[in-house]
């Protein structure tokens, strides 16, 4: 056995302790200024310090898992109650507002009506299943081909549409003849509430939809997504909003607006008021009217929750229409950007947009809304005076090499200016990097967790012409940790038929992979490209290699 093989076989993936607090303390020791983006004393490193552990499950000023879950559900139910009040009493207009709600609503209806014209022939074209958990399938069994192959769930109101769309797919019909149990649908009362981690104080609530409801909802979502692109709102590209946020932080021309529980604040009355009647009726038919919360069924006053297949596109369209109608009303022609509930509009009309949003039942999050100053935030991008100050987060304990290498790369990639990493973070990077085997250094991808990005080891190209090595086409050389994935190669006849139906919908190879706990060391070779360098590394014999 070679020395190299022995070295790899003896590699210990796990660390002896969680290093998260050590990273935090090192950053806190060099942080100065205020972490409040609204403050004149704001500094990026103080912002990083206070954000670093906000998503860690055990550290920081957080709550336990049960409390986070209960707070998330309580927040969802509170939003549902607000929607119920709007459904009963209507929208509450502030008499001091500088616009007429009837005029604004007429403009909004016109914008949405024109955007969605000809919808009746488009809604079934892009229906498909997601790979998420549903009321009929747990997450580990939620591959789309399994939903096609097995008996699907549906609400009573959506049953007619589900039968109609299934009968238009010939592979699905043939499958049902061979496997009769998949021909009929299983009726369920509604969706089911679950929570996912958001930060260490509160979880995020969402819902698992019945299978066929989700299938139909995604058809609507895909249609709205394509139509929004015709007016400059591309829901497949977050970088548009990110660039606009950078522009706003640089010259103050654009404001970024954040809403609290945005999608859960879309009331039934709001959708009824904005959408064409026939389209509203169809969306109302395929949504879940009831939900299971902690084993009890409740009625949804909000129109759709996160987890519904059209919620993201519907809220994007609604916010686009509100902002655009406000622009028209006040004769503003500036740039707008919408990505879900990430709203960007010209600074001069931002107060009017906030008024309109509040009128329709939305709650602006003023802590994360920026209409003045030099800070802007949108779609995960954070800019101060045009410079990227996005913090990184420790979302789980740093207890193995993968999590350690990821945080080392985050440290190197934070606060980079002209290719130079922040020198204040070098000490913690250098100290923790000693725990990683040296053959895992030399990578170039700062988003990776399978090697450490560092000034690369060069591999020269031998030239037969002059008999020496040249570095004109240098590549990095080293190793990386690779997770072992096992691919399912054999499928039952039923699931193989489901794979064909899934292929008929989306094309491409339909596979099913499972991750195992095993890892192995693999050689890596990447084209040399610039990586951020700490000033302390810019001297003779200073490279960690």
Swiss-Prot record:
Q: What is its EC number?
A: 2.7.7.48
Q: Name one GO biological process term.
A: viral RNA genome replication
Q: Which UniProt keywords apply?
A: Nucleotide-binding, Nucleotidyltransferase, RNA-directed RNA polymerase, Transferase, Viral RNA replication
Residue ranges of the TM segments: none
GO MF terms here are: nucleotide binding; RNA-directed RNA polymerase activity
Domain RdRp catalytic as annotated: residue spans = 243-373
Pfam families this protein is in? RNA_replicase_B (PF03431)
Q: Which domain of life is it from?
A: Viruses
Q: Which reaction does it catalyse?
A: RNA(n) + a ribonucleoside 5'-triphosphate = RNA(n+1) + diphosphate
Chain's role: This is the catalytic subunit of the viral RNA-dependent RNA polymerase complex. This complex is involved in viral RNA replication that produces (+)-stranded genomes via a complementary, (-)-stranded intermediate.
The annotated subunit structure for this chain is: Part of the viral RNA-dependent RNA polymerase complex, the other subunits are probably the host ribosomal protein S1, EF-Tu and EF-Ts.
Which protein is depicted?
RNA-directed RNA polymerase beta chain
Q: Which organism is it from?
A: Enterobacteria phage fr
